[in-house]
Regions:
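DNA polymerase sliding clamps and clamp-related checkpoint/processivity subunits
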Residues: 1-19, 24-151, 157-247
Length: 247
């Protein structure tokens, strides 16, 4: 298995986010692309990242392959990536993942070997679920709202009421409500749920990777989905379970 991309910084940014959510994970390599699909340790959130083979400069994978890595250790190596670097990732044995970071301008070539892990984990299958509404907004605005509300409360409520996207929270000493008018997105219903700000603040660290975020809600309010693009390589989606009402 081997791939090469000039969008190395995007992969670095993705693992920078994932290291605070996941520990040891399996990477699923197929002829179609690379995927991480796993639950966090508390089994509250599901992470689904898929990078499409057709978007790499080079991609070679004849058969499906599963290999385990420690996300933090992987990021420690990817952290060496800077602007204009090219990343090559290759697996030639069961023991190591080989990473190569090249920069033609600086004329540098750095190579690493990361020890692989044997992770006994059944692959999760995400059922095809029709999302009822998707609200697109600047990722930096959504991050700021979540960060501000975490100073007031531990949870927030996200509501889509026709053309209004409402984010609100109730704290011990103050409440906050922010309303955004969605003039370009037609929706005639009303959906809402309560979600953990701890997790939302972890997910919104992906803001630096993508200028916009899609906040997707489904009719049964079982979970919320945040979707970010990983540059032009693919997408990173976070599924967060809706908190059960105390009522």
């Amino acid at each position: 298995m081997k791939f090469k991309t000039i969008q190395a910084s995007a992969i670095k940014s993705a693992f920078e986010v994932l290291k605070d959510i996941l520990n040891d994970v399996n990477l699923y390599f197929t002829p179609k692309g690379v995927q991480i699909l796993t639950l966090d340790t508390a089994r509250v959130a599901l992470v689904d990242m898929f990078l499409d083979a057709s978007n790499f400069e080079e991609y070679f994978c004849e058969a499906n392959m599963v290999t385990g890595v420690n996300v933090t250790n992987m990021y420690k190596l990817l952290k060496f990536i800077s602007n204009n670097d090219t990343l090559t990732l290759e697996i030639n044995s069961r023991d190591y993942l080989e990473l190569r970071i090249e920069n033609s301008i600086k004329r540098t070539d750095t190579r690493f070997k990361l020890k692989l892990l044997d992770i006994n984990e059944d692959q999760i299958e995400v059922p095809v679920i029709k999302m009822s509404v998707s609200t697109t907004m600047p990722s930096i605005d959504f991050q700021r709202i979540c960060r501000d509300m975490s100073n007031l409360a531990s949870d927030l409520e996200i509501i889509r009421d026709k053309q209004q996207f409402i984010i609100k929270c109730q704290g011990d000493f103050a409440n906050q409500e922010t309303t955004i008018n969605c003039i370009d997105e037609n929706f005639e219903g009303k959906l809402g749920g309560k979600y953990s700000l701890k997790y939302l603040n972890l997910f919104t660290k992906a803001t630096g990777m993508c200028s916009s975020v899609q906040v997707m809600q489904e009719e049964d309010n079982r979970f919320l989905v945040l979707k970010y693009n990983v540059a032009n390589l693919g997408e990173l989606k976070f599924y967060l379970a809706t908190k059960v009402s105390d009522d």
